[in-house]
Amino acid sequence: MKVLILLVSLISVCFSQIAPKPIIVGGVYRGGETCNSLQPPYTCSSDDLAGGIMMRQGACTYFRGLSNLPTTYNSSSDGSSVIQYTYSADDYFCQESPIQTQTISNGDCEAGCSNDKISYLYNLSSDSNDQVPKNAVLTIKSQSSNCATDWETTWESIEYLNTDTCIVDEVTGGSFKVSCTQGGMTIYSYAAPGCTNNPKVYGVGFYTDSCDGYQVCSL
């Protein structure tokens, strides 16, 4: 009996060590409204989904629209919400005490402003499915030294930008959309919202110099 109990204990310990961390999935919706025009309750429409982020629980990351400061995300103990911990700007690895904590119910649509003119809408949810988004440009953060071949199993966070989706440019007030191949991405830049009329076209190679921001095209 003692041997059986010991065996079960060892199996439990091994499982806890190899079990993947929960995934926190965020969607960012960019409708282009002014910040002052938004009033709760907010609506995150799938038609406006520009991209988002996938995060391992506890990974230190930045993501425009959710936070411009170092941030970690954890699932609540009952799995009903996501807890966002924000750290000071110089706490690059989220090692000190957080300066702000926010609890977001799974699926709730939240608003955040990057400046006085453009707003972001986003929602967060806990998810055990780590399937990588398709038809998107991926920017990957990994602790691996060989992420060119193993990023799919070693990633800590993945920021993704959906291809062929019109996105409001928060800097210029215009709009843009992207397409991609394994060699890089093409950016179509428009002077006005709506992605219509005579875009300027730019070809951009992917960043592949390190595993902190490694880029690929997911088809």
Curated annotation (Swiss-Prot):
> Which range is the signal sequence, renumbered to this chain?
1-16
Which Pfam families does the entry mention? CfaA_B_C (PF11912)
PANTHER family membership: COUNTING FACTOR-ASSOCIATED PROTEIN A-RELATED, COUNTING FACTOR-ASSOCIATED PROTEIN C
Keyword Secreted: yes or no?
yes
The protein's location, in the record's own words, is: Secreted
Keywords, A to Z, come to: Glycoprotein, Secreted, Signal
Tell me the name of the encoding gene.
cfaC
Q: Name one GO cellular component term.
A: extracellular region
Species assigned in the record: Dictyostelium discoideum
Q: Which residues are glycosylated?
A: N74, N123
The main location is: secreted
Q: Coiled coil located at which positions? A: none
**Source species, domain of life:** Eukaryota
The name of this protein is Counting factor-associated protein C
